[in-house]
Amino acid sequence: SVNTLKKFGGLEMSDIQHEKEYVNYHKHSHYSNIRTIDCITKMEDYCDRMKELGHTVISTVEHGYQGNVHGTNTLAKQNNFKMIVGVEAYYVPDRYVKDRRNFHIILVAKNTNGYKDINRIMSEANRTGFYYKPRIDDELLFSINPNNIIVTTACVAGRLREEQGRKEWILKMKNYFKTYYLPIYSTSE
């Protein structure tokens, strides 16, 4: 059943917007290995390292789904962390077309309604957009209230990797979503 973020000990983004703490919202755990072998780190290991670093916010953002929300919530409570929930979704132009090509996109809930929106579109992606992976398209993405989620371009598998239509896509996202970001990754050693 859909429960509220508050019930899960969740985090409203206003709780951290004025703090200067680094929050790793885009990380994966061993739960992402359902479809893509991406990470062997367990959430317990993240918690241990987060305590060493003095972090106070844990996220559950996995490939194609929100991850083990209940388990992460239990760990958050045990470690006195706040929790945020998101998904690294698979974005396609049309979820009804059977084509394995996709782009990654991160959706992070800013509030309880954002959490419900992510649950809703990912459920629909599994029902009507599943082709090897649950895929979302503009119809699902733009059905989300733009005030309820943070959207980022994810990683090297995101939409920015394809030059054709890149600028138009960025503007479309920026013009709809109130919090749309293009992350910067360090590639230096």
Where are these regions (language model features)?
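Phosphodiester-processing cores and adjacent nucleic acid-binding clamps
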Residues: 1-189
